[in-house]
């Protein structure tokens, strides 16, 4: 059990990034209603935060860059918890380092880019010479299940770690609803 074992102390921040440069004629870049960076990637970037910090976030905030068609080409989702925070960065026309960082009071976990495909993660401490490398085995198929399985491996949980619990799915759906309201407000003043 790595993340919640106390090895990195108390988890205070989870940051996940998933970006790619989609072509202009792709669905992600051409469909203002159902394309865009948030709807395309947030189910992946929010998953580590929800799995590690839980569903009881206190506030959600969106920073959104739109193109001239009203497609969100880069969106940051900030979640605030009582004693932690999370940032999910999503992009279809902005490229960034696609890594996952889980910051704690004694160290941090780094899953290098592309973290959603990685087969390893590292634990870093204040002493830069102290780095632990983990290469757990994965089972199951499907992108979301692999990410969830990866997070469960960081947590040290092997049984059914790939399953998204009902309350986690509901929390992520609530964030999606909040995004759709914010997008509508920013684009249409509603």
Name what the model sees in each region.
Residues 1-60:
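Predominantly a Rossmann-like dinucleotide-binding segment in NAD(P)-dependent oxidoreductases
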Residues 134-148, 164:
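Active-site loop of classical SDR/Rossmann-like NAD(P)-dependent oxidoreductases
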Residues 13-17, 113, 120, 125:
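Mobile, glycine-enriched helix-loop/loop "lid" segments at the mouths of ligand-binding/catalytic clefts
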Residues 15-18, 64-66, 168:
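A general secondary-structure junction signal
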Residues 29, 40-47, 72, 142-145, ...:
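Generic recognition of short, well-ordered alpha-helical interface segments
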Residues 45-120, 147-160:
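Contiguous beta-strand/loop segments that form the cofactor/metal-binding neighborhood of enzyme cores
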Residues 149-190:
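C-terminal helix-rich "cap/oligomerization" subdomain common to oxidoreductases
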Residues 128-133:
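Surface-exposed loop/edge segments in extracytoplasmic proteins
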């Amino acid at each position: 059990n790595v993340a919640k074992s106390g090895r990195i102390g108390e988890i205070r921040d989870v940051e996940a990034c998933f970006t790619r440069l989609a072509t202009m004629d792709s669905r992600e870049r051409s469909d203002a209603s159902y394309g865009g960076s948030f709807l395309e990637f947030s189910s992946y970037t929010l998953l580590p935060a929800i799995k590690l910090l839980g569903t009881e976030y206190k506030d959600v905030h969106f920073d959104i860059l739109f193109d001239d068609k009203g497609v969100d080409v880069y969106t940051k989702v900030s979640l605030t918890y009582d004693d932690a925070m999370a940032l999910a960065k999503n992009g279809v026309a902005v490229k960034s380092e696609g890594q996952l960082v889980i910051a704690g009071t004694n160290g941090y976990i780094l899953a290098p880019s592309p973290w959603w495909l990685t087969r390893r993660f590292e634990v870093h401490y204040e002493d830069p010479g102290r780095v632990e490398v983990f290469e757990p085995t994965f089972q199951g198929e499907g992108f979301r299940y692999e990410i969830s399985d990866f997070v469960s491996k960081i947590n040290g949980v092997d049984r059914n770690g790939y399953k998204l619990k009902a309350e986690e799915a509901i929390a992520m759906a609530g964030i999606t609803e909040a995004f759709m309201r914010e997008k509508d407000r920013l684009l249409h003043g509603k």
